[in-house]
């Protein structure tokens, strides 16, 4: 199981995280030191995370999760390491490499490669969801599947 923990206030409504057993849940409410979450089949009784005893844990981005959201490899580029392009959305390019999804903002093709004004790397699903929201893609972030 992943040893990383998240502070409750670092989450946003709609973010995916899991409990200490790896059970995935989606955040429904966030406070300073607590967060409530729900999961498929839940009958309205929210799960409570807190920063002391029941800390939320991140869900690592995997190839399977990307495929579940219809993000498929569209090509690759050789930078320092191999990066597989999994999605283009307007001025954004999403590259997958070694367990990390990088979002290239305002990317351009240059000398048979890519350059970008800003590059944000995400290892966890909740990080990706928050970057998508900041980039104006809230619908995609809130409908992300695990």
Predicted regions and their residues:
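Intrinsically disordered, low-complexity regulatory segments enriched in Ser/Thr/Pro
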Residues: 93-121
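Hydrophobic residues embedded in beta-strands of well-ordered beta-sheets
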Residues: 34-35, 78, 101-103
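Mixed-charge, Lys/Arg-rich low-complexity intrinsically disordered regions
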Residues: 1-11
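Intrinsically disordered, low-complexity, charged/polar segments
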Residues: 44-72, 117-135
